[in-house]
Regions:
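N-terminal leader/targeting and accessory segments in enzymes
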Residues: 1-83, 87
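Phosphate-binding loop of NTP-binding sites
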Residues: 81-185
Length: 185
């Protein structure tokens, strides 16, 4: 949990606590920041009221809106999301040597082999889920949205991983999910 003032400058932000980051209004819980990213079929600005009704403490937008909670206006919410998530989770990507695997075929196989070759100090993130010596969980997307991705990075770091073998989809590059990352390989 962080104060909103640790993430953004603004009057009164010292009194607002942030519990998490969400881009899906249906998943918002009290204290979350709701980031209004734009997707192929939906513009999350259209779901601000739903997010607020579920307890969003703040909304991040890239156009002027009227709402009953603090609003942070940025140039581009899709580009802002990985920066915000990195900061919220205390820059976990800086503690991982990330090995990114991209391509049409073979990403899962190559990422899995790399993780197994490196051993317990290496996590895996991709089609098979998020996997390390301390957890093994399914995920929805090969490369999740940044609100989830940086949460996973933090979990890998907290579990003792030094390396991460990660499938990187073209969609993730296109959607700015990987903008803030420096790949070692």
């Amino acid at each position: 949990m962080k104060k909103l003032s640790e993430l953004y400058e603004g009057e009164g932000y010292d009194n607002i606590w942030v519990k998490g980051i969400k881009i899906n209004s249906k998943e918002v819980e009290p204290g979350d920041i709701f980031v209004c990213v734009k997707g192929v079929t939906a513009d999350r600005h259209d779901f601000i009221e739903e997010a607020i009704s579920k307890g969003a403490s703040c909304v991040v937008v890239d156009r002027s809106v009227t709402c009953s909670v603090p609003m942070v206006k940025v140039k581009n919410t899709n580009e802002e999301l990985p920066l915000l998530a990195s900061k919220f989770y205390d820059y976990p990507e800086k503690y991982l040597d990330i090995i990114g695997i991209t391509g049409t075929n073979g990403k899962t196989t190559v990422a899995t082999i790399i993780q197994e070759l490196i051993g317990d100090s290496c996590g895996y993130l991709g089609t098979n889920g998020i996997i390390c010596s301390k957890f093994n969980e399914s995920i929805r997307n090969t490369t999740p949205d940044s609100d989830r991705l940086y949460n996973y990075f933090r979990r890998f770091v907290d579990s003792g991983c030094k390396y991460l073998s990660m499938e990187t989809s073209s969609e993730a590059f296109y959607r700015h999910r990987l903008d803030n990352l420096t790949f070692k390989v």
